[in-house]
Regions:
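Glycine-rich, aromatic-bearing surface loops/beta-hairpins
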Residues: 120-168
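Short, flexible, solvent-exposed loop/turn segments with mixed acidic/basic and small polar residues
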Residues: 8-16, 110-119
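Surface-exposed, low-hydrophobicity interaction/linker segments
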Residues: 59, 63-108
């Protein structure tokens, strides 16, 4: 009697999960100063604070305290040693919760990069959900009008090798 082994392969495409727009910002300012100037030049009022420990259904979230303090935390294991990287994050939601804006620092507190293939960008502005092309161009121009901003450019997240770092 012969046995037949069947193999199941699951091909997961990250591109189907990338439902956001990504803007790269090169700027020597600290993150809180950049947030101040973005709110001054546009209508986006970023907030950095503690995330609710309870979700909208009343259940406790399965996140550790570092993640609740509006950090993105990534763990890497090298030679049986676990290292954590903490990236600061600021958030803004409009009144109707149609848009979510996240300002992410490309450099962690420990010195590692969130998107290692784009080391020249200091920050990333991630916009979840749909935004009109004209509104997007206007937002990029508003960011470019900040005197300390050297470069603001829309990026294609599907072309990035470390795009999974932007899914949270």
């Amino acid at each position: 009697m012969s046995t037949v082994k069947k193999h199941l392969t699951i091909d997961f495409d990250f591109d189907s999960e990338l439902d956001f727009i990504l803007i790269g910002i090169s700027c020597p300012l600290r993150d809180y100063r950049l947030c101040h100037f973005i709110s001054k030049y546009s209508s986006i009022e970023f907030v950095r604070g503690k995330e609710d420990y309870i979700d909208h259904k009343g259940y406790a979230k399965e996140k550790d305290k570092d993640e609740m303090d509006f950090h993105i935390v990534y763990e890497k294991t090298k030679l049986k040693k676990v290292s954590k990287s903490h990236f600061s994050m600021y958030r803004y939601c409009d009144e109707n919760f149609e848009f979510e804006y996240y300002l992410l620092n490309n450099r962690s507190i420990e010195g590692t990069l969130l998107i290692s293939e784009l080391p020249n960008f200091d920050y990333f502005l991630l916009i979840k959900h749909y935004i009109d092309d004209e509104d997007l161009r206007g937002l990029i121009e508003e960011i470019k009008n900040i005197p300390e901003v050297l470069l603001a450019k829309e990026l294609d997240p599907s072309s990035l090798k470390s795009k999974e770092n932007l899914i949270f």
